[in-house]
Amino acid sequence: MSNINLATLDISEHPNLPSSSAVLFEAKARKKLSFEAIASAIGRNEVATAAIFYGQAKASAEDIVKLSEVLGIDHLYLESLLSGFPDRGKSMTFPPKDPLIYRLFEIVQNYGYAYKAVMNEKFGDGIMSAISFSTKVEKETDLDGNNWAVVTWRGKWLPYSRF
């Protein structure tokens, strides 16, 4: 377990995160659990699970029970922290300063119009939902031993209404 890479949180660098973030990350570090392990234990996707930790996704009542068990956090306390609705989007500065998050922003900045054009040609005039949405991250290793990040976005297509 000591060689596992674990995402941690320095709350002083993220002052806009909800108080639940510090509690969740402290328990995650104490238990030495990856998001993959936590997600498996609660029956959620690992990105969705991480989004709960960052206050960007709503935890269901079932999620709260399972997180409480997996992380060893008092259920009523965790419920008091996670029962509200997320205040999405205010947790970071814009443009992002973290290099990896900035690269994701840069991908959309550089390829956004290309994505839009191709999607419009395939689906018509509309948008890809970020609400009826799922995502996943996979690791791929090529024949030369190079690691590649494979990020999949899957959003429902929403055509614009004519009125």
Curated annotation (Swiss-Prot):
Pfam families reported in the protein's UniProt record: Cyanate_lyase (PF02560)
Lineage top rank: taxon: Eukaryota
GO biological process: cyanate metabolic process
Enzyme class at the top of the EC tree: lyase
Reactions the enzyme catalyzes: cyanate + hydrogencarbonate + 3 H(+) = NH4(+) + 2 CO2
Transferase among keywords: no
SUPFAM superfamilies, alphabetized: Cyanase C-terminal domain, lambda repressor-like DNA-binding domains
Family annotation (InterPro entries): Cyanase (IPR008076), Cyanate_lyase_C (IPR003712), Cyanate_lyase_C_sf (IPR036581), Lambda_DNA-bd_dom_sf (IPR010982)
Entry EC number(s): 4.2.1.104
Keywords: Lyase
Similarity field: Belongs to the cyanase family.
Function text: Catalyzes the reaction of cyanate with bicarbonate to produce ammonia and carbon dioxide.
Name of the protein described by the UniProt record: Cyanate hydratase
Species whose genome carries this gene: Paracoccidioides brasiliensis (strain Pb03)
